[in-house]
Amino acid sequence: MALNIENIIAEIKEASILELNDLVKAIEEEFGVTAAAPVAVAAAGGAEEATKDSFDVELTSAGDKKVGVIKAVREITGLGLKEAKGLVDGAPANIKEGVAAAEAEEIKAKLEEAGATITLK
């Protein structure tokens, strides 16, 4: 038995809304499917961070070892001593913006090792 697509489409065009509704229900029951559109699920806050492409590395606090943190900031940013000190003294401040996740984690580890408190945003 070969299907004639044109005949099926012509029959559907001539059917009323009620007949089409019954057809959809019959197809759903026969094949165990649903005609409902998939609903987009909102991501949780944690899941959103996991899919984030770039991060801002924020120095929240310099901690007790301010000199070590200033050295680390200079190394990471390439700033001069005065600029790096100003950045550390002005905490909270962004050290780097729009960096990849892996680089952000490296920067965070380096600054935390120096004694700073870091937040990735």
From Swiss-Prot:
Any one Pfam family match given in the protein's UniProt record, by short name: Ribosomal_L12_N
InterPro entries the UniProt entry points to: Ribosomal_bL12, Ribosomal_bL12_C, Ribosomal_bL12_C/ClpS-like, Ribosomal_bL12_oligo, Ribosomal_bL12_oligo_N_sf
GO cellular component: cytosolic large ribosomal subunit
The keyword Transmembrane belongs to this UniProt entry's keyword annotation: no
Domain of life: Bacteria
Gene3D superfamilies noted in UniProt: 3.30.1390.10, Single helix bin
Entry keywords, A to Z: Ribonucleoprotein, Ribosomal protein
GO molecular function: mRNA binding; structural constituent of ribosome
Subunit description: Homodimer. Part of the ribosomal stalk of the 50S ribosomal subunit. Forms a multimeric L10(L12)X complex, where L10 forms an elongated spine to which 2 to 4 L12 dimers bind in a sequential fashion. Binds GTP-bound translation factors.
UniProt similarity note: Belongs to the bacterial ribosomal protein bL12 family.
Name of this chain's protein: Large ribosomal subunit protein bL12
Organism: Streptococcus equi subsp. equi (strain 4047)
